[in-house]
Amino acid sequence: MVQKSGMSRGPYPPSQEIPMEVFDPSPQGKYSKRKGRFKRSDGSTSSDTTSNSFVRQGSAESYTSRPSDSDVSLEEDREALRKEAERQALAQLEKAKTKPVAFAVRTNVGYNPSPGDEVPVQGVAITFEPKDFLHIKEKYNNDWWIGRLVKEGCEVGFIPSPVKLDSLRLLQEQTLRQNRLSSSKSGDNSSSSLGDVVTGTRRPTPPASAKQKQKSTEHVPPYDVVPSMRPIILVGPSLKGYEVTDMMQKALFDFLKHRFDGRISITRVTADISLAKRSVLNNPSKHIIIERSNTRSSLAEVQSEIERIFELARTLQLVALDADTINHPAQLSKTSLAPIIVYIKITSPKVLQRLIKSRGKSQSKHLNVQIAASEKLAQCPPEMFDIILDENQLEDACEHLAEYLEAYWKATHPPSSTPPNPLLNRTMATAALAASPAPVSNLQGPYLASGDQPLDRATGEHASVHEYPGELGQPPGLYPSNHPLGRAGTLRALSRQDTFDADTPGSRNSAYTEPGDSCVDMETDPSEGPGPGDPAGGGTPPARQGSWEDEEDYEEEMTDNRNRGRNKARYCAEGGGPVLGRNKNELEGWGQGVYTR
């Protein structure tokens, strides 16, 4: 009853729902009560302050969105400085085109420029791959050098210094590490790691050899200093010191001397330059081991020879080495010489046997040794050689070699570097003024130009740019005068008298000066009788035995070798010239004159 009367007194009928306004008649009443709770001493509320701060913040943002005059001028100044620095870099780049080569490097890493590399001039950085060769002209700053890729058609540009390459490598490793960490935080990786912990399993640790290998690859320097011109070294068909090998190599040296007259230095090297490994020269503890061993050359002699080869290459002439001790490309793979290995190849062992037997009993008794050496060379992969000469005729082999060397000459002498090399002029003048020397029996004797001083260390000792961490950005040749690499004026101009037109009778050096004494004039010894394809002999000295024209019986065995595709010269521009054909007569041209053209 009371409840009914109470309900009847209400302003709304019982059938209708009670609106919320009954509890809060004014819409602002609820908020006013809450505002009252957060009133400050000054009478303002937190909501008022918040709304005011929103207004102020919006007005500040709208104000700062419009750049001021000082900001615009600062940006313009920055752009002007960038353009001025780029203009100066382009001017220095243009001047460097005619400057001589300071030094050369072989790359151990590749580089492909990206916009974030901060190149002094965008679009002028040099792209290179591992095992490429670079000619460095000068240092631009600590991060960049000026040089060019040794390839036909390539001009000078900016090359990252070892410091720059190391910083790029560290940045790349940091990015990869962050990516691995982010990927390891995913659910799959976390659950798998939890499973490892629960089950007690443990990830296998890499073996010690793998760790050592990884450690060694981390410390490989980005560049190795090499001669400015790669020296040419002949190997094959068998061992040097035996008549067949010496005869065939002598014919090629004769050809090189005449074909590249004025552009090539041919010198004999008697020291065992295979000892000039970077690991040996840079490790004093290994010097004692080498000195105690029964090697034919001391380290001092080896260092002297390496030093001499580097100095000859500074003239940017072709350098050909008649190296007595080099019979396999692996002997020089760990040295700083980076030679052009020319392989004279006789594919058929029977042909080589016939040639060795034709030289007489003194050579036949060493037949097995020579055949074994030839087989070792034949087992090498083609990548170990720069040129493989397996032509049957000497003229074809000579043209094949000349084609490669002409391409290399163009790659190292771009048209932009037209001014003559002052080092070449100085060297040629020194050679012209030198008196006719006596036959050189010991090639290790020093022949210093006037005022020259011997180096304390061989050039091969600092074959790596990375070995001077305090001067990584400074290339050799630009070091202070007290630095071993900075003594350009103290290096020997012509330290061996047999380099230019040396004539030592009875030695292999006579191959460089007397083409008439070459194997191309050799005839058959009458005591042995002419071979199946030999011309009528007679009247020749006994030392000149046999000819390479007596091998027609084995023509069918060599036919499969005639279709070999020659390797394209790595220094040629894209779309090189046609490759010369092969003649069918087997080894006939090796017994004919090649200069009557």
Curated annotation (Swiss-Prot):
The record's function comment reads: Regulatory subunit of L-type calcium channels. Regulates the activity of L-type calcium channels that contain CACNA1A as pore-forming subunit. Regulates the activity of L-type calcium channels that contain CACNA1C as pore-forming subunit and increases the presence of the channel complex at the cell membrane. Required for functional expression L-type calcium channels that contain CACNA1D as pore-forming subunit. Regulates the activity of L-type calcium channels that contain CACNA1B as pore-forming subunit.
- For the modification Phosphoserine, the affected residues are S44, S47, S73, S186, S193, S547
- Annotated Gly residues bias: 530-540
Q: Name one GO molecular function term.
A: high voltage-gated calcium channel activity
Under which name does UniProt file this protein? Voltage-dependent L-type calcium channel subunit beta-1
Q: How does it sit in the membrane?
A: Peripheral membrane protein
As recorded in Swiss-Prot or TrEMBL, the protein's gene is named Cacnb1
Please provide one cellular component term from the Gene Ontology annotations of this protein.
Answer: plasma membrane
Keywords for this protein:
Calcium, Calcium channel, Calcium transport, Cell membrane, Ion channel, Ion transport, Membrane, Phosphoprotein, SH3 domain, Transport, Voltage-gated channel
Give me any GO biological process, just one. Answer: protein targeting to membrane
Tissues with expression: Detected in the inner nuclear layer in the retina (at protein level). Detected in skeletal muscle, brain, heart and spleen.
Cell compartments where the protein resides: Cell membrane, Sarcolemma; Cell membrane
Composition-biased stretches, type Polar residues, lie in 54-71
Pfam families cross-referenced by the UniProt entry: Guanylate_kin (PF00625), VGCC_beta4Aa_N (PF12052)
Query: What family is reported?
Result: Belongs to the calcium channel beta subunit family.
Can you state the subunit structure given in the record?
Regulatory subunit of L-type calcium channels that consist of a pore-forming alpha subunit and auxiliary beta, gamma and delta subunits. Interacts with CACNA1A, CACNA1B, CACNA1C and CACNA1S. Component of a calcium channel complex consisting of a pore-forming alpha subunit (CACNA1S) and the ancillary subunits CACNB1 or CACNB2, CACNG1 and CACNA2D1. Interacts with CACNA1S. Identified in a complex with CACNA1C. Identified in a complex with the L-type calcium channel subunits CACNA1C, CACNA2D1, CACNB1 and one of the gamma subunits (CACNG4, CACNG6, CACNG7, or CACNG8).
**Glycoprotein found in the keyword field:** no
Which residue positions does Phosphothreonine occur at? T499
Annotated spans, Disordered? 1-78, 179-223, 466-487, 499-597
